[in-house]
Design a protein with these regions (language model features):
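Substrate-binding groove of N-acetylhexosamine-processing glycoside hydrolases
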Residues: 149, 158, 169, 201-219, ...
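Extended acidic/polar, glycine-enriched regions
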Residues: 12-50, 67, 86
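Substrate-binding cleft of carbohydrate-active enzyme catalytic domains
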Residues: 54-270
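Short proline/glycine- and polar residue-rich coil/turn motifs
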Residues: 542-549
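Aromatic, loop-rich ligand-recognition surfaces of beta-strand-rich domains
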Residues: 472-537, 549-588
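Acidic, glycine-anchored loop motifs typical of Ca2+
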Residues: 440, 456-475
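Extracellular/lumenal ectodomain signal focusing on beta-strand-rich modules
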Residues: 44, 57, 106, 361, ...
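Single conserved hydrophobic/aromatic residue that forms the stacking wall/gate
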Residues: 1-7, 11
C-alpha cells in the first residue's frame, strides 16, 4: 500500500517482504514527473496493489545470436521496472553453446562461434561452427564469472534467473563437439542426444552440477521440446534400452531421459521445468511445465496439479511481427501486435476451478533466429513487454485497453530516453485493412462445394470459411486463412439464383519461409446449371517463388455476366509445392 499526501509518504507492505517494498518504489519511479527544476513531483495518491500471478517471466534465446553481459543486465533493469520477477535464460541450442562448463571446455571452444555473421546465413550455409580465432568468427559465450555477475545483478532486483539447458533435442552443437553422445546407425547425427547411452546421462548430470553451482534458482529448465525419434529408431543402443525397459515406442525414450534428469535434480535439491512436451510422461508433483502450444496443453498441466507457466505462441512469442510485415524487419512470421498481447487472458474455462492455484504465471519469449543485433532484440520486446507485464500483474476486471495504450505511448518515450530501442508505437500501421470489417458481398453466407478439399491442418471456418465475409489478416495462422495441399483449390459457390455479376476476386498469400506460395494460375468460371462452366479469365502468377517477402495478391475478374454458380480454381505451382492459402471468395 502506497500513500502520498502533501509532504508525507507512507509505504506499507502487508507481506513485509523486500520484494514488496521494491515494487512499491518502482511505482514511485513510474509516477514521478520531472518538474523542470531538476526535482521530481509525485501526485497525491493512494495505491493498494498486488500481483495477480507469482511467476511473471521473460525469456531470451542467446543461442541463435549471442548478446553481451551488459545487454543482458540492461534487459534485467527493464524487467525490474515493470515488476517481472523471472528471467528464463535459453543458454544452449543447436546454433551455439553459450555457457562455460569447466569439465567440457570443448563445448564453448568448438561451438560458441560460427563462420557466419547471423543465424540465417549459418542455417543456409551448412550449419558449421568454428573457433574464436577463425576468420569471420561470430558469437561468444558467458564465462562462469559472467553468469555469477548476472545472477547477482538480477537478485538485487528481485529477479530469479532460470537457466535452460536443452535436452534431448536442439543439441546439434553438443554433438558437434562431443560426437560420442550421438546415436549410432546409418543416419548422420541429428539434434538429439542418444538416450540409450549411459555416457549421455554422465554428460548431462555433470553439466547440471556446474549449472546448479552457478544458479541458486529453485527450478532448472531442461527444454524437452521438439525431439525427433528418427535416429532412435535406427540406433542399436536406443533399441537395446527399449528392450530392457519394455518400451513399445521410441517416444518413451524421451520420457525415460526426462524422468532420470528430474530424479537427479530432485536428489540435488532442485526442481525441473520443461516445455509442454514433457507432459507425455509421468512427472513428479514438484515439476513445472512451460506451456507454449496452446490452451489444451495448459489445461492438461493444470488438471494434473503441476505448476504451470502459460506462454502460448499466439500471445507470448515476441519474435513474431508486431506490425504489417512489409513495414518491419524480417521476422520468423506470425503477427502479434501490442493489443493482442494485452488481450491475453491466461485462465480459461478449460482449467478446473479447484486447480487454479496451479497456474503459476505467464511468460514472454524471444527466439532470436531473425534478430541478429541487440537493438533489434529491444525493438521486438518493447513495448510488448509492457502488455505482458500488465497481464501478469493486473486482475482482469482492472484492465482497460484504451487506458493502457495511452500510457504505453508515453512509456515508449521514457524507454527511448533511457536508451532502449523500441518499436514506433505512435506510427503503428495495424492489421490488414480488409480484415477489420465484414465484407457483405453476394456470396456471403452461401453454400460452398469443395471439389478439392481443404487441409485439415488449416480449416479456418470450415465449409463456410470462404463465404463468411471475413478476410484474413497478415498471417495464415489467424484461423481466417484456409489452406490447401495436393493440386490446390477448386471451389464452387451456389448463389441460390441466377443474378448479375460484375466482379469476382480472391486473395492468396506467399511466404516462402514456411512453404506458403501463390498459385501457379487462377481461373474464374460461371454456370447456370451447375454442370457446364464457362471460363471467364485465367490469371498466371508472375511473382517468383524465390521472393521471400510476405505477399498477399488479389486475383480478380471484372465485367458483366449472369450466373447461378461461380467457381474458382487455383493450381499449386509444381516447382514450389507447399501450401495455398486463401481467405474469401468475393462476388459482387
Amino acid at each position: 500500500r502506497l500513500i502520498r499526501r502533501q509532504r508525507q509518504m507512507c509505504i506499507r507492505d502487508r507481506a513485509t517482504s523486500a520484494s514488496g517494498l521494491f515494487y512499491a518504489f518502482q511505482s514511485i519511479v513510474q509516477l514521478a514527473r520531472e518538474s523542470g527544476s531538476g526535482t521530481y513531483r509525485l501526485p497525491e495518491v493512494t495505491i493498494e496493489d498486488a500481483p495477480r500471478f507469482s511467476y511473471r517471466g521473460m525469456h531470451l534465446d542467446v543461442s541463435r545470436h549471442f548478446y553481451t553481459k551488459e545487454f543482458v543486465k540492461k534487459q534485467i533493469d527493464a524487467l525490474a521496472r515493470y515488476k517481472l520477477n523471472r528471467f528464463h535464460w535459453h543458454l544452449t541450442d543447436g546454433a551455439g553453446w553459450r555457457i562455460e562448463i569447466k569439465k567440457y571446455p570443448e563445448l564453448t571452444r568448438e561451438t560458441a562461434y560460427r563462420p557466419f555473421p547471423d543465424w540465417k546465413s549459418w542455417w543456409n550455409g551448412g550449419r558449421t561452427y568454428c573457433r574464436q580465432d577463425a576468420p569471420g568468427a561470430s558469437g561468444g559465450y558467458y564465462t562462469q564469472e559472467d553468469v555469477k555477475e548476472i545472477v547477482e545483478y538480477a537478485r538485487q532486483r528481485h529477479i530469479t534467473v532460470i537457466p535452460e539447458i536443452e535436452m534431448p533435442a536442439h543439441s546439434e552443437e553438443v554433438l558437434a563437439a562431443l560426437p560420442q553422445l550421438a546415436c549410432g546407425g546409418d543416419l548422420k547425427p541429428g539434434g538429439e542426444f542418444c538416450p540409450g547411452k549411459e555416457l549421455t546421462y554422465e554428460f548431462l548430470t555433470n553439466v547440471l552440477k556446474e549449472v546448479m553451482e552457478l544458479f541458486p534458482s529453485e527450478y532448472i529448465h531442461i527444454g524437452g521440446d521438439e525431439a525427433s525419434t528418427n535416429h532412435w529408431k535406427q540406433c542399436p543402443d536406443c533399441q537395446a534400452l527399449m528392450k530392457a525397459e519394455g518400451m513399445k515406442e521410441e517416444g518413451e525414450l524421451q520420457e525415460y531421459l526426462v524422468s532420470r534428469i528430474e530424479k537427479f535434480l530432485k536428489e540435488n535439491g532442485r526442481k525441473m521445468i520443461g516445455w509442454d512436451e514433457i507432459l507425455t510422461g509421468e512427472l513428479d508433483e514438484t515439476s513445472a511445465v512451460t506451456v507454449w502450444r496452446g490452451e489444451d496443453k495448459g489445461a492438461e498441466s493444470v488438471k494434473r496439479g503441476l505448476r504451470t507457466i502459460l506462454s502460448p505462441g499466439a500471445y507470448c512469442y515476441f519474435d513474431s511481427y508486431q506490425d504489417a510485415p512489409r513495414t518491419q524487419p524480417e521476422a520468423i512470421g506470425g503477427y502479434l501486435p501490442l493489443e493482442k498481447v494485452y488481450s491475453y487472458e491466461p485462465v480459461t474455462e478449460a482449467f478446473p476451478a479447484d486447480k487454479l492455484d496451479c497456474v503459476w504465471g505467464v511468460q514472454g519469449n524471444v527466439w532470436t533466429e531473425y534478430i541478429p543485433t541487440p537493438e533489434h532484440v529491444e525493438y521486438m520486446i518493447y513495448p510488448r513487454l509492457l502488455a505482458l507485464a500488465e497481464v501478469a500483474w493486473t486482475n482482469l476486471e482492472q484492465k482497460d485497453w484504451k487506458r493502457f495504450h495511452a500510457e504505453a505511448l508515453q512509456e515508449v518515450k521514457v524507454l527511448n530516453s533511457m536508451g532502449y530501442h523500441t518499436f514506433d508505437l505512435q506510427n503503428e500501421v495495424g492489421n490488414r485493412p480488409v480484415a477489420l470489417s465484414v465484407d457483405n458481398h453476394l456470396a456471403k453466407g452461401k453454400k460452398v462445394e469443395y471439389v478439392r478439399p481443404y487441409s485439415d491442418s488449416y480449416p479456418a471456418g470450415g465449409e463456410s470459411a470462404l463465404t463468411n465475409g471475413i478476410h484474413g489478416g497478415w498471417v495464415y495462422t489467424d484461423q481466417r486463412w484456409q489452406g490447401f495441399l495436393g493440386k490446390g483449390a477448386d471451389v464452387i459457390v451456389d448463389l441460390e439464383k441466377s443474378q448479375p455479376i460484375q466482379q469476382l476476386s480472391i486473395d492468396f498469400m506467399q511466404l516462402r519461409g514456411p512453404g506458403v506460395f501463390l498459385p501457379q494460375k487462377v481461373s474464374f468460371l460461371i454456370s447456370n446449371d451447375g454442370k457446364e462452366y464457362t471460363l471467364l479469365k485465367t490469371i498466371t502468377t508472375t511473382l517468383p517463388i524465390t521472393d521471400e517477402q510476405l505477399t498477399i495478391q488479389t486475383y480478380d475478374w471484372t465485367g458483366s455476366c449472369e450466373a447461378h454458380y461461380v467457381r474458382v480454381q487455383a493450381d499449386i505451382n509444381p516447382e514450389a509445392g507447399g501450401f495455398l492459402f486463401t481467405d474469401e471468395f468475393v462476388v459482387k
